[in-house]
From Swiss-Prot:
Disulfide bonds join C212-C215, C212-C392, C384-C391. This is Envelope glycoprotein. The mature envelope protein (Env) consists of a trimer of SU-TM heterodimers attached by a labile interchain disulfide bond. GO terms for biological process: fusion of virus membrane with host plasma membrane; symbiont entry into host cell; virion attachment to host cell. Residues 304-324 are annotated as: Fusion peptide. It comes from Bovine leukemia virus (isolate American VDM) (BLV). InterPro entries: TLV/ENV_coat_polyprotein (IPR018154). It comes from the Viruses.
Length: 515
């Protein structure tokens, strides 16, 4: 019977481990992600022009056609603005997980980069319009586009190849308030067939890939087009800011037209000094999850549920500590985020109330001046002596409002995570930091014990030796029989025994051992 019971109990740990393994595999299954490519420019053609408004007008036409299309009722509405001559295109991004484009080079630089080594961003040769100093190199109009890609956060720096050097475009993916409508020339888009075709393309692909962002692609069958509006355009010579060594790249051509679209040949550079030529890059929406041949990226679920569970099983109490710390950190982070939003709303409401109060005070002062002027004109004194009541002005205290402006974000004032030395931010996730914290704690504890081990051993041994020395010493008692001489030598003599009892010495008694 005992053997049968043992055989029945043996499969239970195996079943537990199998179920635990299946659970971990279910938690770590790959999730399908959407990846989009965003590219500007082409190696086969290049266009140089002077005014950034040309590009913004064309994009404005496309966005306006998209916004007014009946097929895009549920799609996001795109808006456009131009600040300091640079177009800005953005739309409110929905909330979602952090996802990056497959062809994008992700960086964490908050400012635009200059394409020349050692040049400051304010002294970049190609930062603004072309100048005389740019005649010895290629000039490509520098555009800054602020795009809100769906389900994307962070800062991107995308590069594309253009003859001469590799310019950089920085996409700042953060929330921007809706600007007023730009004051661009109102062009009649009825005679522009490409605008309607692009809008139709956007409408069709937006429903097919809702998680993909707008993509500018130079791939066929689309080609760059130049919009001609009330201007006769001719192109000849090496073009604007084109060096003599590359003159064989340029094809000379001329045409006379006042409106419509002109399809230029490849490697054709236009030298246009007026704001009537537009370069329209082809626009399409591509889902790289099916088109890309790259293997899909394996995305795990929350590290709190998968990796921390493995750490808890392997490390024991350390893993449990990491899991609890990661969960508490995640909850505290979400709580701080909500509190920051509420704090910002309260500060905005208080500032608006303060602004309204200042307006009320100014209106009251204006009414007071008007009443005083009216009373004096009618022959009376001012308002206060006439009604025989004290008149007071509202004194508004601005100290508390100033303190609100000096408040730091709640995430900087409340420490919810383990601080690195000198407040270094290594860009690690919460569970990784908690794991490193626990491992370092155990490592430091082990080092502390190793340093104190010799001292502890020495103290313990000295204490034991001291206790052994202070203990009473007893003679050894042997149970084996010894010869008579040994017993006689160990026992005292009779005179020595009776000498303490009486002064009279008794007769000697011969003592012998018992048989």
């Amino acid at each position: 019977m005992p053997k049968e019971r043992r055989s029945r109990r043996r499969p239970q740990p195996i079943i537990r481990w199998v179920s635990l393994t299946l659970t971990l595999l279910a938690l770590c299954r790959p999730i399908q992600t959407w990846r989009c490519s965003l590219s500007l420019g082409n190696q086969q053609w290049m266009t140089a022009y002077n005014q950034e408004a040309k590009f913004s007008i064309s994009i404005d036409q496309i966005l306006e056609a998209h916004n007014q299309s009946p097929f895009c009722a549920k799609s996001p509405r795109y808006t456009l603005d131009s600040v300091n001559g640079y177009p800005k295109i953005y739309w409110p991004p929905p909330k979602g997980r952090r996802r990056f484009g497959a062809r994008a080079m992700v960086t964490y630089d908050c400012e635009p980069r200059c394409p020349y080594v050692g040049a400051d961003r304010f002294d970049c040769p190609h930062w603004d319009n072309a100048s005389q100093a740019d005649q010895g190199s290629f000039y490509v109009n520098h555009q800054i586009l602020f795009l809100h890609l769906k389900q994307c956060h962070g800062i991107f720096t995308l590069t594309w190849e253009i003859w001469g050097y590799d310019p950089l475009i920085t996409f700042s993916l953060h929330k921007i308030p809706d600007p007023p409508q730009p004051d661009f020339p109102q062009l009649n888009s009825d005679w522009v067939p490409s605008v309607r075709s692009w809008a139709l393309l956007l409408n069709q692909t937006a429903r097919a890939f809702p998680d993909c962002a707008i993509c500018w692609e130079p791939s066929p069958p689309w080609a760059p087009e130049i919009l001609v509006y009330n201007k006769t355009i001719s192109s000849s010579g090496p073009g604007l800011a084109l060096p003599d060594a590359q003159i064989f790249w340029v094809n000379t051509s001329s045409f006379n037209t006042t409106q419509g679209w002109h399809h230029p040949s490849q490697r054709l550079l236009f030298n246009v000094s007026q704001g009537n030529a537009l370069l329209l890059p082809p626009i399409s929406l591509v889902n790289l999850s099916t088109a890309s041949s790259a293997p899909p990226t394996r995305v795990r679920r929350s590290p709190v549920a998968a990796l921390t569970l493995g750490l808890a099983l392997s490390v024991g109490l350390t893993g449990i500590n990491v899991a609890v710390s990661a969960l508490s950190h995640q909850r505290l982070t979400s709580l701080i985020h909500v509190l920051e939003q509420d704090q910002q709303r309260l500060i905005t409401a208080i500032n608006q109330t303060h602004y309204n109060l200042l307006n009320v005070a100014s209106v009251v002062a204006q009414n007071r001046r008007g009443l005083d002027w009216l009373y004096i004109r009618l022959g009376f004194q001012s308002l206060c002596p006439t009604i025989n009541e004290p008149c007071c002005f509202l004194r508004i205290q601005n100290d508390s409002i100033i303190r609100l402006g000096d408040l730091q974000p709640l995430s900087q004032r409340v420490s919810t995570d383990w601080q690195w030395p000198w407040n270094w931010d290594l860009g690690l996730t919460a569970w990784v930091r908690e794991t490193i914290h626990s491992v370092l704690s155990l490592f430091l504890l082990a080092l502390f014990l190793l340093f104190l081990a010799p001292c502890l051993i020495k103290c313990l041994t000295s204490r034991l030796l001291k206790l052994l020395r202070q203990a009473p010493h007893f003679p050894e008692i042997s149970l084996t029989p010894k010869p008579d001489s040994d017993y006689q030598a160990l026992l005292p003599s009779a005179p020595e025994i009776y000498s303490h009892l009486s002064p009279v010495k008794p007769d000697y008694i011969n003592l012998r051992p018992c048989p």
